[in-house]
Amino acid sequence: MADRLVRAMAAGGGIRLVAVTTTETTRMARERHQLSFLASALLGRAMTAGLLLASSMKVAHGRVTLRTQSDGLLKGLSVDAGRDGRVRGYVGNPSLELDLVGDPASFDFKQALGTGYLNVMRDEGQGPPYSSTVELVSGCIGEDVASYLLHSEQTPSAVFVGEHIDSSGIRCSGGVLVQVLPKAAREPALVALLEDRCREITGFSQRLEACQGDLHSLLRDVFPDLDPEVLADEQAEQPVEFFCPCTRERSRGALALLGAEELADMIEKDNGAELTCHFCGEVYRFSGEDLAALIEALPRSA
């Protein structure tokens, strides 16, 4: 089943909810980067969180970037997610495995990420991007992103991300975002109800798997008291996918920036060049002849 994102409201428009499945997206990332199960789980959670954050952007081409800077064995991760539902990402140590595959609930995310910071950058496509950094709270991604929303955007939020991974692979991956909008934040009873409900939620990954991709059902299961209603407009649902815009032509342009002298050195030493996209793992190879042609195409100095 293709991954999807659903937007909903509750409490007369005072509470915003977003749910997303990233099962195929995480599988693609694992295949592209040859990820261990632990690395797959963490990158899947980060891509899920990125899509949830990007879902509220005002412009279709808006993007959110998540990066961790920490001392953990994963050596950091980076995710680029768009309002258009396209997401990509990578981790520093793709082969990291700390726990038995047979017990995915015991994945030690805290040890994998370690202590450090989460940086979130929002780019609306006009003006300078907005960037904010918060300390990692748990390393489980959901609580870390919720901390960012509270401290950097002053929006009380809960972020639930999860997955089910066993020896056969990635069974499911996804998440839910719930936010109290400004007008509802002035209603203490509603805020208290939501806080109590969020504290009571357990076994999110099991709920995610049980819904079998039905995000409407997932929202009703997680927040039955809120009676969430999926938005009626055309933006209520959208597809989600792992996608990277890198191309051979862009790689050629990156090589051209090195200049004729550096390119000539590559021809002499390696008779070519190889560029690998960090975000998707795609490899672009250029022969010595390709580099020579690139040198010829460079503008001559006056």
From Swiss-Prot:
One of its GO terms (biological process) is protein refolding. Disulfide bonds join C244-C246, C277-C280. Pfam families: HSP33. GO terms for cellular component: cytoplasm. The keyword Disulfide bond applies. It is found in: Cytoplasm. Under oxidizing conditions two disulfide bonds are formed involving the reactive cysteines. Under reducing conditions zinc is bound to the reactive cysteines and the protein is inactive. InterPro entries: Heat_shock_Hsp33, Heat_shock_Hsp33_C, Heat_shock_Hsp33_N. Keywords: Chaperone, Cytoplasm, Disulfide bond, Redox-active center, Zinc. The keyword Ribonucleoprotein does not apply. GO terms for molecular function: protein folding chaperone; unfolded protein binding. NCBIfam families: PRK00114.1 (NF001033). Redox regulated molecular chaperone. Protects both thermally unfolding and oxidatively damaged proteins from irreversible aggregation. Plays an important role in the bacterial defense system toward oxidative stress. Belongs to the HSP33 family. This is 33 kDa chaperonin.
